[in-house]
Amino acid sequence: MPKKILKGTVVSDKMDKTVVVSVERVFQHPLYKKTIKTRKKYKAHDEENICQLGDMVEIIESSPISKTKRWKVLRIVKEGDTQ
């Protein structure tokens, strides 16, 4: 089975070699047909500490790296606004 790739925004980069990525998913409710947005946060491994707050990144599934990390940063899609 291929590994999942998700796209999201970095919401925290305060940990060493770890970033928190918020992934937004849009789907339609099966019964009421209302469009719903949900967000989920994933901790992702960032080996070189290159990701910054606000960056749009792609993350890929991996084997467990720690207790809560099961994703790795694949690439930075778009750099965020740094102030």
From Swiss-Prot:
Keyword Nuclease assigned: no
GO molecular function, one term: structural constituent of ribosome
GO terms for cellular component: cytosolic small ribosomal subunit
Superkingdom to which the source organism belongs: Bacteria
Gene Ontology BP term (one): translation
UniProt entry tagged with the keyword Disulfide bond: no
Keyword field: Ribonucleoprotein, Ribosomal protein, RNA-binding, rRNA-binding
Cited InterPro entries: NA-bd_OB-fold (IPR012340), Ribosomal_uS17 (IPR000266), Ribosomal_uS17_bact/chlr (IPR019984)
A Pfam family recorded for this sequence: Ribosomal_S17
Listed NCBIfam families: PRK05610.1, uS17_bact
Listed PANTHER family: 40S RIBOSOMAL PROTEIN S11 FAMILY MEMBER (PTHR10744), SMALL RIBOSOMAL SUBUNIT PROTEIN US17M (PTHR10744:SF1)
Family statement: Belongs to the universal ribosomal protein uS17 family.
Stated role: One of the primary rRNA binding proteins, it binds specifically to the 5'-end of 16S ribosomal RNA.
Subunit structure: Part of the 30S ribosomal subunit.
Protein name: Small ribosomal subunit protein uS17
Name of the gene encoding the protein in the UniProt record: rpsQ
